[in-house]
A protein has these predicted regions:
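Nucleotide-state-sensitive switch-loop elements of NTP-binding domains
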Residues: 2-7, 12, 16-139
Length: 141
């Protein structure tokens, strides 16, 4: 199973990119056979919004509610990824983080917890880039 972690601030376009990417993987894998995709949504609150949109588009979605997968829900993240791999046997797992998450920590937790390799893609709203850079310089590499 390949794992992609999508990070970015609230409103950066993570869900829009996720939806387009998942559609591409399912519809046109290039080899004529579709990839199986499962999405793991992380929400700080008790209920999700994006999971309903993604399910409405025909995707299998699992949720991590009420915390952040990089810290307070790190153990639940590892368990969820392991269970998703066993239950669904997907080709791709796409993890959409909260807008506050550190995607690199999620990547580290998956590697340390179950030896799962992943890639990180950070989504940025270019119209807000300069403001974000100035306000949160210490977060950027």
């Amino acid at each position: 199973m390949k794992v992609l972690i999508l990070g970015g601030f609230l409103g950066s376009g993570k869900t829009t990119l996720l939806l387009q990417l998942a559609r591409y993987l399912v519809d046109s894998s290039g080899s004529g056979s579709a990839y199986k995709v499962v999405i793991l949504e992380n929400e700080v609150g008790r209920e999700g919004i994006d999971d309903k949109l993604l399910r409405g588009n025909g995707f299998d979605v699992e949720n991590l509610f009420n915390g952040c997968a990089c810290c307070t829900l790190a153990g639940e993240l590892v368990s969820a990824a392991y269970e998703i791999e066993k239950q669904y046997t997907p080709d791709w797992l796409i993890v959409e983080t909260t807008g506050l998450a550190y995607p690199g920590l999620i990547q580290d937790n998956l590697a340390a917890g179950i030896g799962m390799e992943s890639r990180v893609c950070t989504v940025v709203d270019v119209s807000r880039w300069k403001r974000l850079l100035n306000a949160m310089r210490e977060l950027f590499v």
